[in-house]
Amino acid sequence: MRLTPSLISCLSLLHFTSALVAFPGAEGFGANAVGGRQGEVYVVSNLNDSGEGSLRDAVSQPGRIVVFSVGGVIEITDRIVVSKQVTILGQTAPGDGITVYGNGWSFSNADDAIVRYIRIRMGKGGSSGKDAMGIADGKNMIFDHVSVSWGRDETFSINGDVSNVTIQNSIIAQGLETHSCGGLMQTDGGVSLFRNLYIDNKTRNPKVKGVNEFTNNVIYNWGGGGGYIAGGSDGESNVNVIGNYFISGPDTSVTAFTRGNENFHAYVETNYYDSDKDGTLNGSELGVDSTNYGGMDLVTEKYDYPAVASVLSPDDALTYVTKYAGASKVRDSVDTQLVAQVESYGKDGALISDEADMGGAGDLDQGTTPTDTDGDGIPDDAEAELGTDPNTADSMDLDTSGYTFLEVWANSLVPSSYA
């Protein structure tokens, strides 16, 4: 279902959108993504792979805010390609939310994407040599509380002419063997990685080149390919690495940081490493010495990149990530197992070649489709609370905050901060 917004002056709209972050709690290089705020609403009303009311159809055209009137697993055959200026609000799905299973997604050239609270699980049946999520060009994107797993090449990768991207509060897990990679983060345009969990990837947790802010992440059970891999190339990289926790798992056989050189310039601060796999969390701070950071060129001043509002200690980052990372409005069976692995502190975890080892995508409660008399994406009971008219399609009108009423409702469904 598609509706155009009520008439609003372009000047007013541009004023509001330029001053807003993507949603309350958006941080980093991608914080000012606009998404579909200047477009129309599309309600995903079924779990079909394609056709009217499907998620694939929803993201196929630019300028849309996508909400859900159904929860469950969407099984796809071909990759989903996302258009420009699309907002995907998975937290609006009833029941246990949305999982997309069977192949990967491309966000290449999907400028101003906003993606929240959704699970993207590729699997061994997906396209060979492709990422579960990939960006090969584009700008101004933010991914928040996304669970991505089972990529056949990388799990979540960013390459090429890409600028201003944030991945925050997310889980990047279990790239499938024999490749098993967390992802490449290789652009000079700026990537922020905040409060994410990298888990059960043999290598590239992540592999970084260019401009990167890496703060309050948890990295668990990387394999012999490496944890945080510096570029290892002639190109210049300039990064901040702050407040992260690296925890060795059963498959870990190399140190947390590898492949740095004189061209990889890093400001590092308060990063912890628990290497003993003894089932007890007892990591200690890595000394600020190049040998502890894989031969990086360590600098003394932090790069002036868009930072998190509040930097957590590594211990607090671990607590936060295990409680809230991923599509955590309702944790599914896969993410629940992954978090349990982390909390074994070295005893549990595995590199896998088949998602069947995790029970596959699992089953989700589809929930109950809410009553939405005017079909504008906001349920009637929520319209009463917002003060909007349940008989008039006004969800894309602007609230005094500058967000559409649709965004105001969706933002109210989840915390802006989990502090």
UniProtKB/Swiss-Prot annotation:
Family as reported in the entry's similarity comment: Belongs to the polysaccharide lyase 1 family.
Binding site for Ca(2+): D274, D276, D278, T280, E285
Glycosylated sites: N48, N164, N201, N282
Biological process, per Gene Ontology: cell wall organization; polysaccharide catabolic process
Cofactor note text: Binds 1 Ca(2+) ion per subunit.
Residues at the catalytic site: R204
Species whose genome carries this gene: Aspergillus flavus (strain ATCC 200026 / FGSC A1120 / IAM 13836 / NRRL 3357 / JCM 12722 / SRRC 167)
Signal peptide location: 1-19
Catalytic activity entry: Eliminative cleavage of (1->4)-alpha-D-galacturonan to give oligosaccharides with 4-deoxy-alpha-D-galact-4-enuronosyl groups at their non-reducing ends
Biological role: Pectinolytic enzyme consist of four classes of enzymes: pectin lyase, polygalacturonase, pectin methylesterase and rhamnogalacturonase. Among pectinolytic enzymes, pectin lyase is the most important in depolymerization of pectin, since it cleaves internal glycosidic bonds of highly methylated pectins. Favors pectate, the anion, over pectin, the methyl ester.
Residue ranges, compositional bias (Acidic residues): 373-386
Domain called EF-hand: residue spans: 261-296
Keyword vocabulary terms for this entry: Calcium, Carbohydrate metabolism, Cell wall biogenesis/degradation, Glycoprotein, Lyase, Metal-binding, Polysaccharide degradation, Secreted, Signal
Main location: secreted
Stretch list, region Disordered: 350-395
GO cellular component terms, semicolon-separated: extracellular region
Name of the gene: plyC
Location of this chain's protein in the cell: Secreted
Protein EC: 4.2.2.2
Name of protein: Probable pectate lyase C
Low complexity: bias regions: 363-372
One GO MF term: pectate lyase activity
SUPFAM superfamilies: Pectin lyase-like
Cofactor: Ca(2+)
Record InterPro entries: EF_Hand_1_Ca_BS, Pectin_lyas_fold, Pectin_lyase_fold/virulence, Polysaccharide_Lyase_1
Pfam family, one: TSP3_bac
